[in-house]
Amino acid sequence: MKNKFLATLFLACSISTVSAQTPVYMDDAQPIEARVKDALSRMTLEEKVALCHAQSKFSSAGVPRLGIPELWMSDGPHGVRAEINWNDWGYANWTNDSITAFPALTCLAATWNPDMSAKYGKAIGEEARYREKDVLLGPGVNIYRTPMNGRNFEYMGEDPYLASVMCVPYIQELQKNGVAACVKHYALNNQELWRGHIDVNLSDRALHEIYLPAFKAAVEEGGAWSIMGAYNKIRGQHACHNDFTLNKILKDDWKFDGCVITDWGGAHDTYEAAVNGLDIEMGSYTNGLTSESVFTYNDYYLANPYLQMLKDGKVPMSTIDDKASRILRLIFRTAMNRQKPYGSVATEEHYAAAREIGNEGIVLLKNAPVIKKGAPLLPIDAAKYQNILVVGDNAVRLLNQGGGSSELKVKDMVSPLDGLRAVYGDKVAYAKGYAAGRPMYGRADEIPQNVVDSLRAEAVEMAKKADLVVLVGGLNKNHFQDCEGGDRLEYGLP
């Protein structure tokens, strides 16, 4: 009995000693704010500054000396993007980074169902966690100012209230996986053409009633852990280091305690980035560096230039302490969160969620009978139609491939043509009908007129012999359509 007592006492003392030796910042039982304060007190100025800028295309540094890990980010918001190379935009060609492609956020918003938003956030969060991402760059909540915006498909429509309601469950469920939402693009990034140069001027009423409500809901109701700054200027100052929108509105008025992260290449000035609310700088092309070169990350605005300004007393030390505190808080919530689940990817549950969201988001304008007083056309009666013609490039195009940063590498995808053939078999014929060109970023194919005429003529002739024609049209992720970096040139469909 005495030996058992001594053994128990020794074990208790050992646990107490280990606990006493564990730094506060490493102790999960301590409040996050206490951990942030303790970690900050142990860091050098150089280590604090190193937190504030990229170390690769999609990661920022931790503090190796203290065992604090780096942050890994991934494009979203419709799925976790395939792995990108360390220093350039090329794909790493991994064989294990395929995921589920979820419907576009426009489709999610069209469900008008917050439960669908919660399912979306839960599933995409599990996939991001499985892929060991700490920050998912989404959801996008910019308002449709015009239907010509090439990136509208990434957003939740033109209604500020709808976007506000729908983004909250997405964020909450995503972050339950220990993955931060990075709500984008804050703010007023409502066109792609010249997005890095335009200066947006608007009234306070338009700003607060139309363009900011979804961001405000994301912060105050959704509890978003990070925000992505936009490329454009707002009232003369770049959005990624805009004193009015970042310091005054986001951090003071809304009490945002997370990180502001640039869109890639969105920083332009060290002093403004230091004092106007930017926390992490990603993807900059400073000092002659281009998107094709190996980046010297220490040349970033919030790297050595910022460090030197701090040492010279040109910016207050309080700026780096605030930035480092916010970044540490984000790391403790994500990369150092030992309670986060393992995650999963491309599961039947995720496929079912994507299918359910897609079904609820379908907008059927009209399901009229083919003949007066007859039955509605849909669903297609296999016994009635023996020769079904499918027309359209989108019937065979995988729309997850293209669109810029939102393009995805899927584990499995069924095209509309394959889906119809799976049900109706050899009754289904196909004609392309038109040429859309390849889905490319920054440029578009020019289609010769003789090709256009030939494809149209073929489809017309085949349609004359068909009992039923199914046209699969719409935009197709090409540049100057629904693709990052360019806006639509016309209202018409290809």
Stretch-by-stretch model annotation:
Residues A20-P494:
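Glycoside hydrolase catalytic-domain context in secreted enzymes
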Residues M1-P23:
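Bacterial Sec-dependent N-terminal signal peptides
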